[in-house]
């Protein structure tokens, strides 16, 4: 199992001002949680469980820069890059305020 504790991840897409949210992950056994901020995200909290293959199944709540709140769920599947860092392929579904779904990628950063 991948140990996500202390790892930081940044979205591969940037906002209009060139910034992107950065998340710091924590792990105890199969329990994983993270907090994120940056770009269009004022604050985001994530919590979920990690499967033996490193896949994380989590829920999230966030406050966006415009003051909207959003809640949803995400399944993050890891891939190890050539340089040893982790890339997470995220399939997400947002419930409110504008329901939607999509795919994003976040990569391990220092």
Label the model's feature ranges.
Residues 1-19, 87-94, 107-110:
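Tryptophan-anchored aromatic micro-motifs
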